[in-house]
Amino acid sequence: MSQQETHGFQTEVKQLLHLMIHSLYSNKEIFLRELVSNAADAADKLRYLALTNDALYEGDGELRVRISADKDKGTVTIEDNGVGMTRDGVIEHLGTIAKSGTAEFFKNLSGEASKDSQLIGQFGVGFYSAFIVAKKVTVRTRAAGHKADEAVLWESEGEGSFTVETITKASRGTEITLHLRDEEKEFADDWRLRSIITKYSDHISVPVEMWQEGTPERDGPDGEKIPATEGYWKVMNKATALWMRNKSEISDEEYQEFYKHISHDYTDALLWSHNRVEGKQEYTNLLYIPSKAPWDLWNRDRKHGLKLFVQRVFIMDDAEQFMPSYLRFVQGLIDSNDLPLNVSREILQDNHITKAMRTGITKRVLGMLEKLAKDDAEKYQQFWAEFGQVLKEGPAEDFANRERIAGLLRFASTHTGSAAPTVSLDDYISRMKEGQTKIYYIVADSYDAAANSPHLELLRKKDIEVLLMSERIDEWLINHLTEYKEKQLHSVTRGELELGELEDAAEKEAQEKLAEESAPLIERIKAALGTKVADVKVTSRLTDTPACVVTGEGEMSTQMIKLMQAAGQPVPEVKPTFEVNPAHPLVSRLNDLQDETAFADWSNLLLQQAQLSEKGSLADPSAFIKLMNQMLLANMK
């Protein structure tokens, strides 16, 4: 036996242990679910490694998890004969949290137990859940293929440090003993443990066993002798792969528990789909849409993807090749009959079977969402609030399914008068005016900026609906979604408004006449502004505002420029078109000014006002304020 070493926990582990004990007290029994789940994973990993090295079984190929309790000592032990851990593995896995974005996770914690328990559940507490009920945890483990005297003893009271020493252990695998707190001794009761196992572990494909005490010889009711029975390890769960069972035999509760097993989430899934595909490819998939977004959904380093099984043998976690990035929130598994057992991530990358399965699974998920949107709008809104921004990546990523993805998108709109994104493109089309051929939209920094934009004035007057977009991803989305069901999406802040048949002949004639009458004024403004603008025009979109700026059809939009600048990308200079409203008093009075210096000042002031309204900021706000003060003083004399 080697000398004992003491190690300090990683800072994040200390935080997690403290938070878990104080936040998850209302759901203490999850410790057993987490530890049994880990033990089952260890069995799966050994089964996979043994495909290429049968000697790892060491003559014991019957994989199982065993749970026992000692009431007198107040202990619960969870033992598996899975892959086990080396000394380095123990220090790495039981002393640190090897997850990217961990610091960000802790920043999100509020100190409010109910909210934090949800976040901690999403984070995945795993092994550390033992400390919810245990005052001390002892782990004895030996890695498969290693000698008996290369086993490891790990022990901690969860306070800030743990000890590690080398021991001798005849059997491979891991044995975790929980020394229960005095107030948690109920978990040393056999019946309590059995009820938890039945609740949480039926779906696990590895047998979960508990010791069944034998009975002594005794007299029967009629005086006959009932022979003694020996104690034995009794299997407590169905121990079959849930996804291979008939759907009609699986309860909703079993589906939900299986979701929690594979996702390490402890909130229920929103919906799921269990499907067997037969034909050119044969595979089974069980797909879940979570009810809550994981805390690290936007972390670039976050692993995502499905669990991959081949002929019921676990191959890998996070097989991202079967799911496009815009559906990275989907949890679940795929079990293939066509892929080889020695399949690697590299082989999956360019495999025609993989590509066909990815296509089928993508369509399956989109179908799930379409059905949810049709059957339960309220539940779909719950989904959209959690994952809508991720789904918006779809049209740029998946050209083949662009129209289907577009049908699932939701936006705020001038029709609802609410910031809630509840309007689909189909809803919009169903309300289009007679003769309307375009879907009008605006992208701005916020809902209020979009809803109050002067660019909407004429459209509001004509009661034409406009989609209001204000998420950072919306400009990216709209660059890849130019039409839907043969209706062009048209920005109200770019190029001509193009109302087509929505503008009658009299309006067109009046607009042309106004432009003609205002030609001298337009030329004066052009001369005053010089190279600050690409052009100056009489507006066709304003009714109540003196002026606005628009970008050309082929130019980079204001929001795209902001995105590029935020990403540190070089941005070409884009000069706006300045549109003025001659019917507005400020512009009509501008026409009466004979002093060209004053005329230039007023023209510049109107331009900067319009730019401030459009961009929310100015390149040189000090110059604007100086000019504004100068104009105010001049008019106060």
From Swiss-Prot:
Residues 1-345 are annotated as: A. Belongs to the heat shock protein 90 family. This is Chaperone protein HtpG. GO terms for molecular function: ATP binding; ATP hydrolysis activity; ATP-dependent protein folding chaperone; unfolded protein binding. GO terms for cellular component: cytoplasm. Disulfide bonds: none annotated. Signal peptide: none annotated. InterPro entries: HATPase_C_sf (IPR036890), Heat_shock_protein_90_CS (IPR019805), HSP90_C (IPR037196), Hsp90_fam (IPR001404), Hsp90_N (IPR020575), Ribosomal_Su5_D2-typ_SF (IPR020568). Residues 346-562 are annotated as: B. Molecular chaperone. Has ATPase activity. Residues 563-637 are annotated as: C. It comes from Shewanella sp. (strain W3-18-1). Homodimer. Keywords: ATP-binding, Chaperone, Cytoplasm, Nucleotide-binding, Stress response. It is found in: Cytoplasm. The gene is htpG.
